[in-house]
């Protein structure tokens, strides 16, 4: 009975409230433009948004390296840009760093 009384109030609050439009929402990488991936939102974990690939010095996840990825990403970071690698900078910390090939 109590829920029946609360329902009209809830509808009134929902209809009078402001709504938000999330631009760039996605489910998979293929829905994002070139140079982006579909990553978990930092603010609302149940939403994924198109996010730029990691630039030099930005945080990354060592197991996230394929673009486009066929499934749903579990992290809020995208893989690094093609000329960068996700390298460990300290215990548990990874950043996009220049790829040092043919150094010698």
Swiss-Prot record:
Keyword rRNA-binding: no
Cross-referenced Gene3D superfamilies: Lipase, subunit A (2.10.80.10)
Predominant localisation class: secreted
Pfam families recorded: Prokineticin
Residues spanning the signal sequence: 1-19
Any one of the GO CC terms: extracellular region
Tissues where the protein occurs: Expressed by the venom gland.
Keywords for this protein: Disulfide bond, G-protein coupled receptor impairing toxin, Secreted, Signal, Toxin
Record GO biological process: endothelial cell proliferation
Location within or outside the cell: Secreted
Domain of life: Eukaryota
Disulfide-linked positions: 26-38, 32-50, 37-78, 60-86, 80-96
GO terms assigned for molecular function: toxin activity
Keyword S-adenosyl-L-methionine (UniProt): no
Function: Potent agonist for both PKR1/PROKR1 and PKR2/PROKR2. Potently contracts gastrointestinal (GI) smooth muscle.
PANTHER family hit by this protein: PROKINETICIN, PROKINETICIN-2
Family (UniProt): Belongs to the AVIT (prokineticin) family.
Name listed for the protein in its UniProt record: AVIToxin-VAR1
